[in-house]
């Protein structure tokens, strides 16, 4: 490759990071809610992801539970600071809800999990830049895509100008305004509340109402206008959930925002993080129990069948980044305090389902569609189109919350056929001949490790103090998208990981802990990049110094590509 081309490749992530920063500044200046939503420690976290933590003088043995992006980021910054880190992952792969499907025949990719990052997520952009990942534009909106409701089909550039043509009996003051503008009309009262009450009190008020209550009540929208928002903007997924959560989500998810994606697939992010680690990453290693003592934490993991033996690892500190349902399956001794148990039970995960269909050619290009999404009131709800020159693997359906119920319980074949029917209804029967008969379905509510797509809280039924997951329980710390705002985004998981890492790095641990012969710090020093879980029932990680343990399903960067799933 020519030197000039190499220089350009190096500059791509830097330039995109600068563009994202400028886009964020422009969007922030226009969004009156941005200041209220902004994390007070955001700039500090940005510095940590850029420069790392201060080098520790007292390395600690840290066990990170979960190899999703939160666990991997925390492991990286703690390892870089000099701590001895081991990651335990119950699944047979890394990445968590970052899950890239790769078609073995065509090379086309589809994102079963995370697929975009808004320009306001500067921490995530900086992380990708630091790992050498190339970013490019994610097309959220294309004016030539379609909206079909009540058997009326219009191009989205028409819907933006005259949404009443879809058949909604809008009030005179609602007609001629885009769905986004109608939503902003409803937020006028919320803006007044922000100015009168301040962010803290206003958000507490918003947490007590559903989005539907607010839009019809204080928002003073007509029922047809609210139905329009539900059909066209998928706001119906929030209708019975907290208005505060809807506000947070809308600050990151709008067709008017700018988004980026990772060139080559989002799974390159966890792979890049993995390659930067020096400690153990154990797969197929579900944590079943934790016992805190005065000097360390004993972590029990279950080995793979048929033995199902328990093994014990010791650490000075544990960071729990697993999903809420996974954490609830762990036995804690002493038990988690009541307020933490209640906080875990309060976590409300909504289902999320994606259905991809593979076609022989990108037929949507003939309709001048080069990305973005179409909307339908049929079961598939949202259809996302891949960018030009990236194949014909179509995200034929993306549903979440109550809308995902349409695909629950269906067989893989039934789910594919249902999505195909909806695509054919929108684009014509010719798509049936163009479908190559293959596809992939991912239902996150049925994933045994996440048991849900992401967290969105319902209204608070009574006044409670906000759950503060940044406060550790003894030697146990918490991170993950469920522990911070806004829920459901990769950057949120990263922010939570950085906060936990800062606290762990500043913790004053006894020097003797780091050299304990009963711990596993010595194993980590001797083994370097060993990935897998011990398969021998009698193998004791704490006693194997300077040698590689037997591994089961050894992980490498080459075998993390994903085959078709039947979920």
From Swiss-Prot:
**Which consequence is recorded for altering residue 102 to G?**
In an ovarian cancer; decreased L-amino-acid oxidase activity
A GO cellular component annotated for this chain's UniProt record is:
extracellular region
Give one Pfam family.
Answer: Amino_oxidase
Pathway membership, UniProt? Amino-acid degradation; L-tryptophan degradation via pyruvate pathway
Result of altering residue 92 to D: Increased L-amino-acid oxidase activity
Mind listing the UniProt keywords for this protein, alphabetically? Answer: Adaptive immunity, Cytoplasmic vesicle, Disulfide bond, FAD, Flavoprotein, Glycoprotein, Immunity, Lysosome, Oxidoreductase, Secreted, Signal
**PTM (free text):** N-glycosylated.
Binding-site residues, FAD: 69-70, 89-90, 97, 113-116, 287, 481, 488-493
* Principal place of residence: secreted
Q: Which residues are glycosylated?
A: 54, 134, 220, 559
Signal peptide residues on this chain, from the entry's feature table: 1-21
Q: What EC class does the entry list?
A: oxidoreductase
| Activity regulation description | L-amino-acid oxidase activity toward phenylalanine (Phe) is specfically inhibited by a number of Phe derivatives, such as Cp3 (ethyl 3-(2,6-dichlorophenyl)-2-(piperidin-1-yl)propanoate) or Cp2-SO4. Cp3 is a very potent inhibitor for activity toward phenylalanine but is toxic. In contrast, Cp2-SO4 is less efficient but not toxic and is able to reverse immunosuppressive action of IL4I1 in vitro.
Q: How is this protein induced?
A: By IL4/interleukin-4. Expression is up-regulated in numerous cancer and metastasis: expression is induced by immune checkpoint blockade.
Q: Where does substrate bind?
A: 116, 398, 488-489
The record's disulfide annotation reads 36-199
Q: Biased-composition ranges for Polar residues?
A: 553-567
Task performed by this protein: Secreted L-amino-acid oxidase that acts as a key immunoregulator. Has preference for L-aromatic amino acids: converts phenylalanine (Phe), tyrosine (Tyr) and tryptophan (Trp) to phenylpyruvic acid (PP), hydroxyphenylpyruvic acid (HPP), and indole-3-pyruvic acid (I3P), respectively. Also has weak L-arginine oxidase activity. Acts as a negative regulator of anti-tumor immunity by mediating Trp degradation via an indole pyruvate pathway that activates the transcription factor AHR.
Q: What is this protein called?
A: L-amino-acid oxidase
Provide the species name.
Answer: Homo sapiens
Q: What is the lineage of its organism?
A: Eukaryota, Metazoa, Chordata, Craniata, Vertebrata
Instruction: Give the encoding gene's name.
Output: IL4I1
